[in-house]
Amino acid sequence: MNAAKVVEDLKMRFPNEPEYIQAVSQVLPTIEEEYNKHPEFEKYNLIERLCIPDRVLEFRVTWVDDKGNVQTNMGYRIQHNNAIGPYKGGLRYHKSVNLGILKFLAFEQTFKNSLTTLPMGGAKGGSDFSPRGKSDAEVMRFCQAFMNELYRHIGPDEDVPAGDIGVGGREVGYLFGQYKKLTHQFQGVLTGKGIPFGGSLIRPEATGYGTVYFLTSMLATRNIDIKGKKVLISGAGNVAQYAAEKCLQLGAIPMTMSDSDGYIYDPEGIDRAKLDYIMELKNVERGRIKEYIEEYPNAKYYEGKRPWYEKADIALPCATQNEINGDEAAALVKNGVIAVAEGANMPSLPEAIKIFQDAKILYSPGKASNAGGVSVSGLEMSQNSERLSWTAEEVDNYLKRIMNDIHENCVKYGTEADGYINYVKGANVAGFMKVAKAMMAQGLV
């Protein structure tokens, strides 16, 4: 395989999907050496088969707003690869959603799910509908209209969606209710469900907790304790909230949180009471992060900016893709950050990743460090299949073990000659090899 040539060919075929091309171009060079050790991969054109989704579903979603006006949005489901298990990946409701973004997410999800060691393929879906500013009734009607089409393409052994940006417990509940009404079946066809109807304990916390568990494993390779470390966190949604919670539990000090309008910096640190306020603000009141300074006036709010120029020890980007550019990465390194663990999907631009790696700081890509969410989704699928509910302690112990296993695989495949652990290479090679071997064993399908 010539990785550069494959990327150029894909650019020509998909010129209007920059996020997808970015994801592929970041992965292929890191697996090129390992791929070329296996001539049978090239014979069966494995890399092109892995890069291009099995199936791309596009559909119209028509719904009625509270004023009686008919609205139309686009719906998507990218079923990328099911070589190691049923398609698995979240649904994103955000105005930025398009085919290129979802193809990048589905591609990344395939590697991430492989890393978990659980039998799950890769997928992603969603819509350019945004729940922000919509009434609860409007969100319900949209979710029902979305499921009216999606239900034909999913199932507990076929494709199991979950939540993502804009799709939380409320939306998953509406989607599941409509699926049940349409099919007359109560199945584990969605994960992230409420506890009373088949959800798993620790699922809301899993991505944030898992990111911090992975971070502590990274720090341990250099005999560094997380206790007392100052942490920059972006985002204020599910991932950011529970990453902050786990940091607090382990003695670290969250200093920032953000949303799409700007970020807050609290020089005193965000303690338990302050985090509870943020959770109430974002999850119940659906407010904006700038309201934090009204409650805690010693904090500062920066409109339209991101938190990466602040001084701290650790950075946890937990908001969205491409949120750290080269200048921001250089500022993080200059200001003494020793570790960056991605809680979001592909939040660091390629030039930012290069700066982190050139500086030899600890850096992990999202497919490794944020795999806790889909890991517990897999555990939710297991509980649904068994008709059992595990305790929070049981699920959390599974999560810790899975994140530790992912870290060990990254170290195995990513340790370089000078001892530096290239987590990007390690995660990509480890995830790729499992999927590649499964695809080879199953023939040209």
What positions do the PLM features span?
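Structured beta-strand/loop patches that form or line metal/cofactor-binding pockets in enzymes
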Residues: F41-N69
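Adenosine-phosphate binding glycine-rich loop
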Residues: N2-A23, M218, V333-V445
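Phosphate-interaction motifs
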Residues: F59-M120, K124, D128
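Glycine/serine-rich phosphate-binding loop and adjoining beta1-alpha1 elements at the start
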Residues: H94, N113-K227
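Flexible, glycine/charged-enriched surface loops at secondary-structure junctions
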Residues: I21, K37-Y44, T117, I154-G163, ...
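Glycine-rich phosphate/diphosphate-binding loop of Rossmann-like nucleotide-binding domains
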Residues: T191-G194, G199-K311
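Rossmann-like adenosine-cofactor binding region
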Residues: G262-Y363, A368
